[in-house]
């Protein structure tokens, strides 16, 4: 995790622990620079990250203010860190269906920008929230980047392992959303009937150097999944 990201996390934790509400004012820029012993540019990047996440808003000449917290149980479509943190107040578990090393499908190779002869980790799992099915997930990880996975890792947060275990820096993602109907396989794993509605998300996650490392296809249980996009000047 880069320094500005670490500071952003600490500021966000401070907001949560002190139960700050929308409109509460945070320390001024100079105070934050002194507190964290970093340059103005680093603090500015931290605040920009928090603003993009919807945690704060800045008013020129007035200061830095807390923004209204998003509702509990909603998954942010703007997060690059996986959705485990969005659901930290809930019991999120995973059931691993498949985990192996194989060659990519043409679709995975294209989205990961790799050759058909390169190895990938293929992961198929079902995610649960408080014991109820949340989503059915198929993921392809470039093995030359994500060098090791096992059942224990895949049963928990893969992104936490990628950041903390492998020391990789996750940069940005591209998400493609579709509304459709569950096929037989998806319905079976989600405990629903085929033909019921689903939100289907294809995601491509990249490192900070722009290299894609994860291509995932996720079908969400419409009864259990809720999403949020907190728009700001970066999106409008």
Curated annotation (Swiss-Prot):
InterPro entries: Bact_HTH_transcr_reg, Chorismate_lyase_/UTRA_dom_sf, Tscrpt_reg_HTH_GntR, UTRA, WH-like_DNA-bd_sf, WH_DNA-bd_sf. Residues 1-69 form the HTH gntR-type domain. Residues 29-48 bind DNA. The keyword Iron does not apply. CDD domains: WHTH_GntR. GO terms for biological process: negative regulation of DNA-templated transcription. One of its GO terms (molecular function) is DNA-binding transcription factor activity. Keywords: DNA-binding, Transcription, Transcription regulation. This is Uncharacterized HTH-type transcriptional regulator YydK. It comes from Bacillus subtilis (strain 168).
């Amino acid at each position: 995790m880069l320094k500005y990201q670490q500071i952003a996390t600490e500021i966000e934790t401070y907001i949560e622990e002190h139960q700050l509400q929308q409109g509460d004012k945070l320390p001024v820029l100079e105070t934050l620079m002194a507190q964290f012993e970093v340059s103005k540019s680093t603090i500015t990047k931290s605040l920009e990250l928090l603003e993009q996440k919807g945690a704060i808003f800045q008013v020129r000449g007035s200061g830095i203010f807390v923004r209204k917290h998003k509702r509990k149980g909603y998954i942010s479509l703007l997060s690059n860190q996986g959705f485990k943190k969005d659901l930290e107040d809930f019991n999120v578990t995973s059931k691993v269906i498949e985990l192996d090393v194989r060659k990519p499908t043409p679709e995975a190779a294209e989205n990961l920008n790799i050759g058909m002869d390169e190895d990938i980790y293929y992961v198929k799992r079902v995610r649960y929230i408080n014991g109820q099915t949340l989503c059915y997930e198929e993921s392809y990880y470039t093995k030359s980047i994500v060098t090791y996975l096992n059942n224990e890792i895949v049963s928990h947060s893969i992104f936490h392992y990628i950041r903390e275990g492998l020391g990789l820096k996750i940069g940005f993602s591209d998400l493609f959303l579709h509304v459709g109907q569950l096929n037989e396989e998806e319905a079976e794993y989600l405990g629903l009937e085929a033909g019921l509605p689903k939100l289907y998300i294809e995601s491509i996650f990249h490192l900070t150097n722009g290299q894609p490392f994860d291509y995932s296809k996720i079908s969400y249980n419409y009864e259990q999944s809720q999403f949020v996009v907190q728009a700001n000047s970066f999106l409008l």
